[in-house]
C-alpha cells in the first residue's frame, strides 16, 4: 500500500514557516514510526514574506498624493452601501488603525466611525513592521528587486476578501476608479 499527503504550511515569515515545517515533518516521522511505515518527504514550493522598503513607500506616497481621489457617483455609493449591508464589519476600515492610535483617530473621523460605505480619502503615510496575512507573490518579488506597495479603494469598506461581495465590486466603476 501507498499513501500520499500534501501539507501546506503558512506563517508570517519564511523563518517561522521553516520552523513549522520541521515540526510537521517530525509529527509525520512519529506517525510513520507508530504505524511501522516508511516516510519520504519532498519540499515542493514556498513563498516569502514581503520585505518592506520605506524609501519606495515614501516615493509611492509622494506620487499618490498628487493624484486626484476618485469621485464616486450616487449609484456607486448606493451600490457600495447595499453590499456593505450584506456583511458584518467590526472595527475601523484600516489595518493600520489596529496598530497606530493616530491612524485610528484619523480613520474614525474620516469614516464616521466606520459607517461610510467607501473610503474616499487618502490615508496618512504609515509604515508597518507587522506582516499582514495573505497570499501573494509580492513577497517573492521583494526579495529579488526593490518593491513597494500601496492600497487603494476597489470595493466597499471592510468587504471580506475572497467573498462574493469582493467579486461583485470588482467589475464596477468603484474598482476601476480605484485602480486608475
Ranges and model annotations:
Residues 1-180:
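Metal-dependent amide/peptide-bond hydrolase catalytic core
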Amino acid at each position: 500500500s501507498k499513501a500520499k499527503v500534501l501539507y501546506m504550511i503558512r506563517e508570517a515569515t519564511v523563518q517561522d514557516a521553516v520552523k513549522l515545517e520541521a515540526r510537521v515533518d517530525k509529527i509525520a516521522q512519529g506517525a510513520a514510526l507508530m504505524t511501522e511505515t516508511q516516510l519520504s518527504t519532498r519540499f515542493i514550493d514556498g513563498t516569502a514574506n514581503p520585505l518592506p522598503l520605506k524609501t519606495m513607500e515614501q516615493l509611492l506616497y509622494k506620487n499618490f498624493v498628487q493624484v486626484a481621489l476618485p469621485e464616486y457617483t450616487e449609484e456607486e455609493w448606493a451600490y457600495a452601501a447595499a453590499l456593505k449591508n450584506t456583511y458584518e464589519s467590526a472595527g475601523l476600515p484600516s489595518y493600520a488603525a489596529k496598530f497606530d492610535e493616530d491612524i485610528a483617530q484619523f480613520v474614525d473621523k474620516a469614516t464616521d466611525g466606520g459607517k461610510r460605505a467607501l473610503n474616499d480619502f487618502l490615508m496618512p503615510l504609515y509604515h508597518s513592521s507587522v506582516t499582514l496575512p495573505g497570499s501573494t507573490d509580492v513577497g517573492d518579488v521583494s526579495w529579488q528587486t526593490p518593491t513597494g506597495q500601496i492600497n487603494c479603494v476597489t470595493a466597499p469598506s471592510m468587504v471580506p476578501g475572497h467573498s462574493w461581495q469582493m467579486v461583485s465590486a470588482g467589475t464596477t466603476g468603484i474598482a476601476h476608479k480605484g485602480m486608475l
